[in-house]
Amino acid sequence: MAGIGFELKKLFQKRGLAATAKAYGYAGVICTGPMLLGIVLLVGIAFICDHTGATRHNRELLNCMITYTLLASLTVTSFFSMVVTRYIADMLYEERHEAVLSSFWGSTALLLVVGGIMYGIFLLFSGINLIDQFLCLEFFGELIVTWNAMSYLTAIKDYKGILISFITAVAVSLLVGFLLILIGIPHVEALMIAVTIGYGIMLLWDVTLLYR
């Protein structure tokens, strides 16, 4: 979060209650965006399930799949976050911006391979069907890239753009999930597809910001 921290520091230097509240608000939403999106999606999914006749088993299965995947991705990326943050700070200090982007893809590939193997083994013994295993693994991969990208975002000023990406991701996920259920796709698969689409939107947005 080095780059985010540098820019948020400028907001905190501004005086006034409104400026301070704005800085804290941006810091909270930006740094916890993926997890916040997960919580909102879980609430939205529960609402959709209640109004579309989903069984209790399906609701609990969805909650477990999403929660376990979130926790697994956070656990894997946490082992690298401190090293990544220190490296970003050093490269920015030395004004070697090209090294930051190249290391992003290198660290992302490493996290995807190591994390994907570990989580893939877990899914094999989880007891869920093959389609759900694939959706969970895809969701896990998106989360890995998203968490890592959040550590690499540098010199960000378009905070409103980031917030819009969060809101758009939630809206699209819930809308797509509802539509997929309406056309007859089972609840678990429909809503997992919707969640991967939602986080996919945020992933693409974050990676795009890295190249601005």
What are these regions (language model features)?
Residues 44-70:
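Interfacial/gating helices of multi-pass transporter permease domains
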Residues 1-41, 60-64:
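N-terminal membrane topogenesis motif
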Residues 1-20, 151-155, 181, 199-212:
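C-terminal transmembrane helix end/exit motif
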Residues 165-211:
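Hydrophobic alpha-helical transmembrane segments
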Residues 75-106:
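Transmembrane-helix boundary and interhelical linker motifs in polytopic inner-membrane proteins
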Residues 67-72, 125-153, 163:
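Alpha-helical transmembrane segments of multi-pass membrane proteins
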Residues 27, 99-100, 158-165, 191:
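Alpha-helical transmembrane segments and their helix-entry boundary regions
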Residues 81, 105-128:
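Alpha-helical transmembrane segments of multi-pass membrane transport and lipid-handling proteins
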